[in-house]
């Protein structure tokens, strides 16, 4: 939304959009030796973008953050990564632990999990904040957050509802049944039937959960029907 106009429901402006896009202004692309080979490289120079609303130049900056000092020889994407993983960044840790929560509990504390905004608050903001703070303090220990979630009392809840939580659909008073991912379901069927699904170009015995990318979706009717995402877009 903020590319063409100020965001209608959030605080982000077009300037915020172009400041974020400026981190990628020095990314170059060239053809490789092979027909379908692209080479992505860093172009030297000052990273900047043009705010198309008023045609003013803007420097790279994270959302709600000051512009970092980036030398002309430095890759501005490194500065973006530094901002994303900074302990005072209010976005990365919250988004990360929310996605892990969605993976294990079937629904994020913020739902949908890719719609993190002030006008779509978490059902338990204190819990999300506590998980994010612990994730940061641990040095972004992914195994640690998995261990905490899987050892929690909430994760141990039965999926069989009782008269107190039968109507609950978002407070996590019970475990919500969720559909298996397409890859997991295919591997489970292979195990039960003792018949292995083969994938052209990969070694025999390769399981669906081991596929290196999504190009195999078109070669597997099962994965296509049962919803393995193509990752063709970010939305």
PLM features per residue range, with description:
Residues 214, 218-226:
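Active-site Gly/Thr loop motif
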């Amino acid at each position: 939304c903020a590319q063409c106009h100020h965001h209608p429901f959030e605080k982000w402006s077009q300037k915020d959009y172009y400041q974020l896009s400026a981190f990628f202004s020095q990314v170059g692309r060239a053809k490789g030796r092979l027909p379908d080979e692209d080479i992505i490289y860093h172009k030297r120079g000052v990273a900047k973008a043009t705010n198309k609303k008023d045609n003013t130049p803007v420097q790279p900056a994270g959302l709600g953050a000051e512009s970092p000092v980036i030398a002309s020889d430095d890759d501005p994407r490194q500065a973006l990564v530094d901002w994303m993983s900074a302990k005072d960044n209010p976005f990365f840790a919250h988004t990360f632990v929310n996605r892990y929560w969605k993976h294990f509990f079937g629904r994020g504390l913020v739902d949908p999990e890719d719609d993190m905004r002030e006008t779509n608050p978490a059902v338990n903001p204190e819990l999300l904040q506590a998980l994010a703070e612990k994730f940061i303090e641990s040095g972004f220990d992914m195994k640690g957050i998995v261990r905490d979630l899987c050892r929690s009392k909430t994760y141990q809840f039965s999926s069989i509802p009782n008269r107190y939580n039968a109507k609950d659909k978002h407070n996590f008073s019970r475990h919500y049944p969720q559909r298996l991912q397409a890859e997991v379901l295919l591997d489970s069927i292979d195990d039960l039937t003792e018949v292995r699904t083969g994938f052209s170009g990969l070694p025999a015995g390769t399981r669906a959960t081991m596929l290196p990318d999504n190009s195999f979706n078109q070669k597997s009717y099962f994965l296509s029907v049962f919803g393995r995402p193509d990752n063709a877009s970010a939305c």
